[in-house]
């Protein structure tokens, strides 16, 4: 089988940088899990959009008299969490469902759980964190109502993101436990090194089944009647 060519992120041809990952839901993810994995992918996209809206809201916050530190941090969060979210929690869950990998499931639970906690903090909106959450938006109405209205939008989006993350992690955990996943399996994958690039379920099946017999088995040759002992 020829090696699959990377297709994500889909970059224009004039850019001298090639895609880093191969992503094809219908080709690599089992049919019964494709909807869930696609929803987690869209959740990553929604969270990236939330960070972009948050950057604009932090600019309005700054213009309205708030601290410029929030705008600077919002810019850092956008640049940092957009690629890191894809690599650190979406790719693990993608590979986990692609290959039924306990190690990647564990990595997803740990990193995505931390992402969920961070998103809840962003939704709350502590000042100086670079996130326009509920506390910062509501508290700014007394200084600049117009800017505060803009700040409410990322507060809502962060809240929706946190709610969807909670639902996603519960659904993935239910599937993981129902399929017999365990920490021991994750340790085995770590010790054998298969966690780096676990083979797809199809590849595992082909390796397991293989060709136990030649396509045209040889007909046994028995001795003639006069040659029996």
UniProtKB/Swiss-Prot annotation:
Key words of the record: Membrane, Phosphoprotein, Protein transport, Transmembrane, Transmembrane helix, Transport
Residues in compartment: Cytoplasmic: 1-39, 170-229
Renumbered residue ranges of the record's region Disordered: 208-229
Subcellular compartments: Membrane
Modified residues annotated as Phosphothreonine in this record: 194
GO biological process: protein transport
Main localization (coarse): membrane
Matching InterPro entries: SCAMP
GO cellular component entries: recycling endosome membrane; trans-Golgi network membrane
Recorded topology in the membrane: Multi-pass membrane protein
Tree of life domain: Eukaryota
TM ranges: 40-60, 61-81, 105-125, 149-169
Stated role: Probably involved in membrane protein trafficking.
Family: Belongs to the SCAMP family.
Name listed for the protein in its UniProt record: Secretory carrier-associated membrane protein 4
Gene source species: Homo sapiens (Human)
Gene name in the database record: SCAMP4
């Amino acid at each position: 089988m020829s090696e699959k060519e990377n297709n994500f992120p889909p970059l224009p041809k004039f850019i001298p940088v090639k895609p880093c990952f191969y992503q094809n839901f219908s080709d690599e993810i089992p049919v019964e899990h494709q909807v869930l994995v696609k929803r987690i992918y869209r959740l990553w996209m929604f969270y990236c959009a939330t960070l972009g809206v948050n950057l604009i809201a932090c600019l309005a916050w700054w213009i309205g008299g708030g601290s410029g530190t929030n705008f600077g941090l919002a810019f850092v969060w956008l640049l940092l969490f957009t690629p890191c979210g894809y690599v650190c929690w979406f790719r693990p869950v993608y590979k986990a469902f692609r290959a039924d990998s306990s190690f990647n499931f564990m990595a997803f639970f740990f990193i995505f759980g931390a992402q969920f906690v961070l998103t809840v903090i962003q939704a709350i909106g502590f000042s100086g964190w670079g996130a326009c959450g509920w506390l910062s938006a509501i508290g700014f109405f007394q200084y600049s109502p117009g800017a505060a209205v803009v700040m409410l939008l990322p507060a809502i989006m962060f809240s929706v993101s946190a709610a969807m993350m909670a639902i996603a992690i519960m659904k993935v955990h239910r599937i993981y436990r129902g399929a017999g996943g365990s920490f021991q399996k994750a340790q085995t994958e770590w010790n054998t090194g298969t966690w780096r690039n676990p083979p797809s379920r199809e590849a595992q099946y082909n390796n397991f089944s293989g060709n136990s017999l030649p396509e045209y088995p040889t007909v046994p040759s028995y001795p003639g009647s006069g040659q029996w002992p």
